């Protein structure tokens, strides 16, 4: 009957307020690392900035959506050399070919008849964080190979500025040579967060860090989604 005596003693110990252990065992709480879940396709549209947010980021007014796409553009035949296509514009088909991406959303915006500001904002979904990271790493190797390029239809020439790679974001500015006053240039930014690539192209007389700023806002939104 010893098993019954032991069971009864244990039950009494649980019920009694004064029953304590005098052992020296320490209780440890396991540390868990929270890993963000991969984003899914239905979330992509909500990542893009509103026209009002774009106005603030680009320091202008009147920005409005002129085009929305879920397929990639292909401007590979209108610029040279081809290795500069990734810097010339965001979300290009030839750039993402064979990358394994799953889905994409993009919007183009400008400020109407004035057309002093332009934005193309794109978010590209990959099946895994690793695949998105591989695309970013390949881009980080490829971007510096471009120094200058030409739009073959218009004959306009562009010079690529210093390329920054910091905090999982590539960025640069490419001014158009011999542009009419007050000038024209385009900013580029490519950011990696979770299983999403944020791909931004901004153009104005002085794009400065507008592409990086917009990419950062969208990237922060990606990071906040658990």
Predicted regions and their residues:
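Surface-exposed amphipathic alpha-helical segments
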Residues: 201-226
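Short, surface-exposed coil-to-beta transition loops
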Residues: 118-120, 182-188
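Short, well-ordered beta-strand elements
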Residues: 119-122, 191-204
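Short Gly/Thr-rich strand-loop-strand
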Residues: 69, 140-185, 225
């Amino acid at each position: 009957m010893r098993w019954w005596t032991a069971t009864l003693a244990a039950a009494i110990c649980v019920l009694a307020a004064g029953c304590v252990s005098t052992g020296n065992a320490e209780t440890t709480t396991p540390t868990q690392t929270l890993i963000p879940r991969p984003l899914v396709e239905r979330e992509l549209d909500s990542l893009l900035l509103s026209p009002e947010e774009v106005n603030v980021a680009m320091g202008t007014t009147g920005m409005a959506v002129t085009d929305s796409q879920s397929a990639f553009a292909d401007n590979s035949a209108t610029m040279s050399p081809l290795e500069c296509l990734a810097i010339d514009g965001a979300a290009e088909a030839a750039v993402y070919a064979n990358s394994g991406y799953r889905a994409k959303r993009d919007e183009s915006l400008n400020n109407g008849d004035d057309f002093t500001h332009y934005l193309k904002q794109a978010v590209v979904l990959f099946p895994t964080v690793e695949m998105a990271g591989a695309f970013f790493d390949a881009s980080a190797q490829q971007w510096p190979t471009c120094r200058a390029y030409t739009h073959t239809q218009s004959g306009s020439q562009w010079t690529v500025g210093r390329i920054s790679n910091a905090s999982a974001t590539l960025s640069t500015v490419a001014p158009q040579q011999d542009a009419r006053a007050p000038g024209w240039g385009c900013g580029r930014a490519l950011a990696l967060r979770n299983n999403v690539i944020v791909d931004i192209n901004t153009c104005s007389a002085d794009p400065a860090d507008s592409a990086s700023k917009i990419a950062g806002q969208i990237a922060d939104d990606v990071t906040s989604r658990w």
